Structure formats: structure tokens, C-alpha cells
Amino acid sequence: MFERLFRKKRFKYKCDECQEYHVGSPSFSMKHPTSFFDVPETERNDRVQYNDDLCMITPRENDTTEDPIYYIRCILEIPIKGASEPFMWGVWITQSKENFERYIETFEANQSNEKSSGWLLVDLPFYNNARTGEPLTHLECEVHWGPKGQRPKVSLWENSHQLAVD
């Protein structure tokens, strides 16, 4: 009886894309970092290098005030009350040039003992508190790189932003 009462439920949802029901928590992923869209389409071929896991955005050729921005794609897990699996956000976290290069160098290896810090630009549905025209919130986080073949996981530093609270 106690097992039935206290067992966590498996989440079930209907996929909008395939119209099928899936068991397990849903996830949502950002295909590109938000700043990708700040680069005009006509300049993206020259200024943006990316794949499914990495992104580097360089400043305009004559811009000496900006540095390149380095991103790695990570997983941010949000627990769902009463569910056995978390909701997962696929997010892009900024990295220093040194950490970005180290991540690339060790990409094909087990990175379980590796970690770095970075920033999450909060442009996620339900969590973006910025008004139109205001800058987006940046949340500091720790990136746990993880086993070979798995995306790194992110833990946000403690703060009062709702995403960190969740």
C-alpha cells in the first residue's frame, strides 16, 4: 500500500510534432544561443561557427571593443513535483576561451571530472523577466561536463530568480 501511495509517477505527454503520446518528462531545447539572432543574417556565415554542441560568435571585423563569445550546449534539469524524471531545458552556456578550448580538446574523452563556470542568458519561456528593450538576465552557473557522449549538466548558483528557485 505504501509503495502505491508514495511511488513517483511517470510523466506522459502528447507530442505536438508527431501527435504520439510519450512516457517520460518532456524537454525543450534552444537550437541556437540567443545572441546568434543578434548577428544579422547577412553576417552569420562570416561571424558564427556552430554545430549541435558548440557555438562561437565573433565581433564585426573592425570592432575592437568586443571579444568573441563562446558557448557550449548543456542540459538544465528542473524537478517536476511528483514525477520521477525532471523537465530538461537544452541551454547554451557561455564559457571563457580557455574553457571552451579545453572542452573541445577533451570532447571525445570522459569529462566526468571536469567542470567550469559560465553564464546562462535567460531567454526561456516563462522565465524571461525582461521587458521589451531591456537587457536579459544572466545567471551564473556551474557546468559539470560529464561522461563521453553526454551533454554537460548545469547547476545554477543560488539566487532569487525563479529559474534558480525551481
Regions found by a protein language model. Give the residues of each.
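Elongated scaffolding segments in large macromolecular assemblies
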Residues: 80-119
